[in-house]
Amino acid sequence: MEGATTKPRLVPSTRFALSLVMFFGCLVTYMMRTNMSFAVVCMVNENKTDTGVEKVSRCGKEMTPVESNSSVIGEFDWDKQTTGMVLSSFFYGYIGSQIIGGHLASRYGGKRVVFVTILGSALLTLLNPVAARTSEYALAILRAAIGFLQGATFPAMHTMWSVWGPPLELSVLTGVTYAGAQIGNVIVLPLSGFLCEYGFDGGWPSIFYIIGVFGVLWTAVWWYVSSDKPATHPRITPEEKQYIVTAVEASMGKDTGKVPSTPWIKILTSPAVWACWAGHFAGDWGAYTMLVSLPSFLKDVLGLNLSSLGAVASIPYIAYFLAINAGGVLADTLRSKGILSTLNTRRAAMLVALIGQGIFLVASGYCGCGQDVLVIIFITCGMAISGLQYAGFVVNYLEIAPPFSGTVMGTGNTISALAGIISPAVSSYLTPNGTQEEWQMVLWLTAGILTIGALLFSIFASGEVQPWAKLTAEEGHEMAPLREGEKIELATA
């Protein structure tokens, strides 16, 4: 049992330090992913591409092209189709490497995969200004290449947590790790707004230079402090190493160093896996809709100008970050104290997260003129409550298929990446004039998808390691010499 081995403190510890380094890795990864969404606002000269017709009145205020673009004059004369091509190109690359990332991490180690993908993304990010000034097609190809590299990053991190994360600490450790993505969003929005106006080389290029350098520096730290497994980490204490190895082996078997073959048929026919994928797609639909469309929604409904947009749009992501970590602590506490089983903890997290987000988003769409603060409160609450999903499907990947968590999550990321392509296009199609009624349709659609995803997850999810994921010695793991009751207790507490 897990209690048979003395539990070393989580803070400070090597496993928690690894989660902090991964936190900053996710932070810089998301900064490189989302920088274009905001930079393009000051890259494109809307005065030249606008039809000259005044925008729809926002609560009685007519927004002319000059007013809506602040003091920034864009360098490029791109129309909306070109801008959309540049913004969506990332996801066309992103969708192509998810499964590869999990497989490579299992075979060669997550440390190397994360290092190569983030370093490559950082170097290509530094080339964004050169590509943009060459042609919009060169920029789109470059963004697709960045997406391809980043597609392998998160499955590789998940693969590492399958061997680094004791089952009863997974919610906290993965929560800290992936919360970095939200802080990346918080930083990149106001940073981009500031650099657009005051940055060097024309303003917007400095966004890519600064973030790219940050990415390169992070990879140097990562290579020094990380290790594929606790057994190979040079600075971990013997007590912590033994605790992690014993806890992980109790649920997935003893690692023999062999690389197991992936049971694709069993994965693709597993209801528990499809439950994660359904929740994953729904959660990402909501996230991508808000990530790409939130600035436009706030501008259309509230009439915010460029200089204030970044700061306001960051507020929901701060709440999101706090909720992810609080949810992880709460989930692990409920499980360790026996208040809820693993399965019911994951169900509760997904139902509250996704349905709650949908309710708040729909409510925000019905706020009237003069209720700007209320709109922001609703959006913030919706984003915050959605952070509980990190204690749902995200951790559940590690619980149902520890040896194949990177591959299974990578496949889920491939499916959910479609949301990154489809949801912005749907939002643009439904909001040609940016009216409140049009945005209400977008928010109702998002709420419907969130609800369906939460229900499917709750019906078909599992809290136990699936039979096909409990490996034998021939398949790469030797089952630990523990009683069956002990294995189940650790995996499903």
Curated annotation (Swiss-Prot):
Disulfide bonds: none annotated. GO terms for biological process: sodium ion transport. The keyword DNA repair does not apply. GO terms for molecular function: symporter activity; transmembrane transporter activity. InterPro entries: MFS, MFS_dom, MFS_Na/Anion_cotransporter, MFS_trans_sf. It is a multi-pass membrane protein. It is found in: Membrane. Pfam families: MFS_1. Its main location: membrane. CDD domains: MFS_SLC17 (cd17318). The keyword Transport applies. Glycans are attached at residues 35, 47, 69, 305, 433. Keywords: Glycoprotein, Ion transport, Membrane, Sodium, Sodium transport, Symport, Transmembrane, Transmembrane helix, Transport. One of its GO terms (cellular component) is membrane. The chain crosses the membrane at residues 10-30, 85-105, 112-132, 144-164, 175-195, 205-225, 272-292, 311-331, 348-368, 375-395, 406-426, 441-461. Belongs to the major facilitator superfamily. Sodium/anion cotransporter family. This is Uncharacterized transporter slc-17.2.
